């Protein structure tokens, strides 16, 4: 259980949050020990930890979920996860990935505007809670679900 959620940190601060990247439980523990209030598992860090190279296409959602779960369980500060384009090609798949990450303790999700991957139509704008297709629609579905049902003790993930 986190001392504070990302939502609380954002609401309580009048400054930008410093969110260092972590790649495993040891780096997460180091970030916590030196006093940071939050951390992020980035796609590049995940790829480096899992494959030894910084190439986003070499990791997958299963690896992200596995590493994020281990990190979230090993720390008392909230974890954000960069899921890039979500590794999925449909709104419902993105929705399910967001739900799975929330269930293992991820409290914030960073997602790219994936129009360069052919998921979002050109010119689509990703707005919290709205679906324009692809990632935006899947994440919008997730946010709407989270708002209606709540997401347990960590206040649901934020973007």
What do the predicted segments below correspond to?
Residues 1-159:
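Alpha/beta enzyme core
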């Amino acid at each position: 259980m986190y001392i504070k959620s990302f939502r609380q940190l954002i609401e309580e601060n009048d400054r930008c949050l410093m969110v260092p990247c972590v790649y495993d439980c040891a780096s997460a523990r180091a970030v916590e020990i030196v006093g940071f209030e939050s951390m992020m598992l980035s796609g590049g860090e995940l790829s480096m930890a899992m494959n030894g190279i910084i190439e986003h296409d070499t990791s997958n959602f299963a690896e992200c979920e596995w590493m994020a779960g281990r990190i979230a369980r090993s720390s008392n500060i909230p974890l954000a996860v960069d899921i890039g384009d979500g590794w999925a090609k449909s709104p419902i798949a993105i929705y399910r990935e967001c739900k799975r990450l929330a269930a293992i303790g991820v409290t914030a999700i960073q997602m790219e505007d994936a129009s360069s991957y052919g998921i979002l139509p050109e010119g689509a704008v990703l707005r919290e809670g709205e679906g324009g297709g692809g990632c935006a629609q899947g994440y919008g579905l997730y946010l709407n679900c989270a708002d209606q049902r709540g997401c347990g003790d960590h206040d649901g993930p934020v973007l």
